[in-house]
């Protein structure tokens, strides 16, 4: 427990927390229902709206009978997940911000790394915590907290990973600036957000869906694959087609965030270099110097390669 406590902090004053969830500095007291610390302070109206959205349908879900081998097989269908797992050292302290039901947190924790999965949706965290117990993973903990006032200690994590989160915040640029403070100098930031180009196919499908009162959603491969899984189909529909807050970003925009916050740009995934072959061993190694025009052309190519699902891309950086 001590190893996890030293990574947490009072969200009010950043003071140390005791084992009974009180702050040594300001005296604030917190609780941990079902073993999940609640270090979330009340948010603004839009943040609370997004939290309520996910409380109704935690995302992504676990199928009946899910096991650790199922989790690994599911994760490793993704080239990115394999590359990420390979790049992170075995003794790393990892934070996943916006972990949802914790599937990536659990996948990374199975290699005996110290992992904290943080989210503002308790219903999702309960599923993740239950899965951790079922899979026998004791190197991972889940906490309920908000990115803008997190119950987490600044500058302590070797890797901060956040995917599918910032584009659902009211101000993604400000949210990124807060996220950067959590990683130690020299540590890695792995950020996944919707791409402005790659999101175009889904936005077109969403337009048709709205105009047809959701009776017609053409050419969505995820819905087609989940035709016989109504719960998972509903979760995808809500997350992709009816989310109350969504932003989309270009690679150049994210690179600007990096520069503003003292983060050295390492690479994009998929690669923003035309003709560059993905290398499983190189996720944390700097790519060749990129040309913004080349990056623009690469992103136009992502319309086809990423647009069949959600259009999410990953940018990797190192805090200086």
PLM features: what roles do these ranges have?
Residues 1-61:
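N-terminal auxiliary segments of SAM/dcSAM-dependent transferases
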Residues 114-119:
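Conserved SAM-binding motif I beta-strand of class I
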Residues 173-185:
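A short glycine-rich, Lys/Arg-flanked "PGG" loop and its adjoining helix->strand segment in the class I
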Residues 101-112:
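Conserved SAM-binding loop of SAM-dependent methyltransferases across substrates and taxa
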Residues 230-318:
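Rossmann-like AdoMet/SAM-dependent catalytic core
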Residues 188-222:
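Conserved class I S-adenosyl-L-methionine
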Residues 148-159:
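A short acidic, Gly/Pro-enriched loop at the edge of an enzyme's catalytic core
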């Amino acid at each position: 427990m001590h190893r996890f406590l030293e990574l947490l902090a009072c969200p009010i004053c950043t003071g140390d927390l005791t084992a009974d969830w009180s702050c040594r500095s300001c005296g604030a007291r917190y609780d941990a229902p079902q073993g999940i610390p609640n270090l979330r302070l009340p948010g603004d109206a839009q943040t609370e709206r997004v939290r309520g959205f996910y409380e109704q349908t935690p995302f992504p879900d676990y199928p009946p009978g899910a096991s650790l081998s199922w989790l690994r097989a599911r994760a490793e269908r993704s080239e990115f997940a394999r590359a990420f797992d390979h790049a992170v050292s075995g003794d790393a302290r990892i934070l996943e911000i916006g972990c949802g039901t914790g599937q990536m947190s659990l996948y990374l924790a199975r290699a005996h790394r110290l992992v904290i999965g943080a989210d503002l949706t308790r219903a999702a965290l309960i599923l993740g915590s239950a899965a951790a117990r079922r899979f026998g993973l004791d190197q991972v903990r889940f906490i309920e907290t908000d990115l803008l006032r997190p119950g987490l200690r600044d500058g302590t994590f070797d890797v901060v990973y956040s995917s599918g989160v910032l584009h659902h915040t009211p101000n993604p640029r400000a949210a990124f600036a807060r996220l950067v403070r959590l990683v130690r100098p020299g540590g890695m930031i792995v950020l996944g957000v919707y791409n402005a180009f790659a999101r175009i196919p889904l936005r077109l499908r969403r337009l048709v869906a709205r105009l047809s009162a959701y009776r017609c959603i053409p050419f969505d491969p995820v819905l087609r694959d989940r035709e016989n899984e109504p719960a998972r189909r509903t979760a995808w529909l809500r997350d992709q087609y009816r989310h109350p807050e969504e932003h989309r970003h270009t690679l150049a925009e994210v690179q600007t965030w990096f520069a503003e916050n003292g983060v050295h740009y390492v690479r994009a995934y998929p690669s923003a270099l035309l003709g560059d072959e993905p290398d499983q061993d190189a996720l944390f190694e700097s790519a060749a110097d990129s040309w913004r025009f080349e990056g623009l052309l690469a992103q136009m190519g992502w319309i086809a390669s990423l647009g069949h699902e959600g259009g999410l891309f990953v940018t990797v950086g190192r805090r200086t």
